[in-house]
A protein has these predicted regions:
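Flavin (primarily FAD) cofactor-binding/catalytic cores of flavoenzymes
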Residues: 1-39, 43-282
């Protein structure tokens, strides 16, 4: 997700997303601004500071969130049961968790706090201008010079923006298309754009005639959260997600090649008993 104020700098090497790797040997002595206060923002801030950069961590919130309700979902029941909930129940769970904001891990905050990083809270970047080879971030009373800006601003949901999915995006069923307008609340725009997935992470086609082809594409990433929970975007649940994906693929491969497997069954002739076990029985 690229905040609007940074959009005109798309492709500029002075701005990158927190999901991109940092070239640590190029950070020493540089001014780095990290936007956001989620875990990835803190991790990037710490890595940059440890590489010798002067780091400013900027957040819109006036205080850091202290609670991570997502930790309450780290159970086998949630991992296996969330996909079985009704659509409205799934939406209610994730609405509440995100509305409460998710605190970065305690050890991550402790790591950042020890590195002399400047924390600027209650500040929203409303203008970005160039200052020589650097950028000047205007956040009201705060003016932050930066050689590199790292956006820890999360991800947006837009399959059409991905080259690999661009030709398929218009055929993919979204959550907006599965729920009536009355089910949605203000602020649900992002949830509406999530793809509505099948039980094995497969895309579901708007047109049933395209399902066989579209169902071959598995969406094993953050976009699966609303349909299947945290099976593809949360470390504690990753093993559950991998198993679900593997089982779904194995089942689909078998069904697709049923004729081959059935013929193999008909041809199977490996004897279990060779005749010497109890000769009078044969």
């Amino acid at each position: 997700r690229i905040p609007e104020v940074f959009e005109r700098f798309a492709g500029d090497p002075r701005i990158q997303h927190s999901s991109q790797p940092l070239v640590q040997e190029q950070l020493s002595g540089r001014d780095v601004a990290v936007i956001g206060v989620a875990a990835s923002a803190f991790d990037n801030a710490a890595t940059a500071a440890e590489a010798g950069a002067k780091v400013t961590l900027v957040g819109r919130a006036k205080t850091l969130p202290r609670l991570n309700k997502m930790k309450h979902t780290v159970t086998a029941g949630f991992a296996e049961g969330f996909p079985l909930l009704s659509d409205s129940e799934k939406l209610a769970w994730l609405r509440h968790i995100t509305a409460c904001r998710i605190a970065p891990p305690r050890h991550t905050v402790q790591r950042v706090a020890k590195l002399g990083i400047e924390l600027v809270l209650g500040a929203e970047i409303n203008e970005v201008t160039e200052q020589g080879e650097a950028l000047l971030l205007n956040a009201g009373a705060e003016k932050i010079r930066s050689d590199l800006v790292i956006l820890g601003t999360g991800f947006t949901m837009d399959p059409a923006a991905m080259p690999a999915l661009a030709d398929l995006a218009s055929s993919v069923t979204s959550w907006q298309e599965r729920l009536p307008e009355s089910a949605w609340q203000t602020g649900d725009d992002e949830w509406q754009r999530f793809p509505y997935l099948g039980k094995g992470f497969e895309f579901l086609a708007k047109d049933p005639q395209r399902q066989r082809a579209l169902g071959r594409v598995r969406c094993f990433n953050h976009a699966a959260q609303l349909s299947l929970g945290n099976l593809a975007n949360d470390i504690p649940h990753a093993s559950f997600g991998a198993e679900r994906l593997a089982r779904a693929l194995a089942a689909d491969f078998f069904v697709e090649d049923n004729a081959h497997h059935y013929q193999a069954l008909m041809d199977y002739n490996e004897l279990e008993l060779l005749g010497d076990e109890w000769p009078t029985a044969f």
